[in-house]
Amino acid sequence: MYKRQVYDYLTEEWNHEACSIPLEIVVDEPKGSAEELAQVTDVLGSFTTSYKTSGSSRSANVANGCSLINGTTLYPGEEFSTYKTVSPFSVANGYYMAGSYVSGKVVDSLGGGICQVSTTLYNAVLLAELEVTERYNHSMIVGYVDPSADAAIAESSGKDFKFVNNTDAPIYIEGLSLIHI
């Protein structure tokens, strides 16, 4: 939050003498209690896709998307929006230019490859038997899952992948990205 203000001060205003920069401390209280989170004990669904043939920018976007969904706790009745969780698609949010599908064509865009994250999550959600509330396919077939097993997200068309925790316990979402060497 203050990163830009500190940078601007140090590069434009600081006279290289001792100084202090006041920072506001915000304490976030956890939403769930330890007892509630202790209910998260089982793997409900797990799915893996490979991106080992992807270029470095696309691979970085997949890894970034995984890190943005990782650690999410979804309580009973709550809806998860993949788009809201991984956006905005910007350099500041860790994204690079890479190929994405737009109207049946491959074009470079910030965050290209992010749909592999939403697709992998979609398949894990299906295996977990959670309630899918919104899902769109791509304009072309993707190579990392079987046809019709994809879940596209896109800012321009409003596509999102959403699901609801229809269980009686919290769900912990773990998103991992492993680099193949």
Residue locations for each model-derived region?
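Conserved small/polar residues in nucleotide/adenosyl-binding loops
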Residues: M1-Q5, I179-I181
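Short glycine/threonine-rich beta-strand-turn micro-motifs
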Residues: K3-Y101
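A glycine-rich phosphate-binding loop feature that marks nucleotide/adenosyl-phosphate handling sites
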Residues: I25-K31, H138-V145
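A broadly conserved detector of short glycine/acidic/proline-rich loop/turn motifs that flank catalytic sites
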Residues: T73, F80, V86-S87, Y101, ...
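Envelope-exposed proteins and targeting segments
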Residues: P76-E78, G111, A128, K159, ...
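Structured core elements
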Residues: S81, Q116, E131, K162, ...
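Active-site neighborhood of thiol-dependent amide/isopeptide-bond enzymes
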Residues: G104-Y136, I141-G143
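A structural-propensity feature for long, helix-poor, extended segments
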Residues: M140-L176
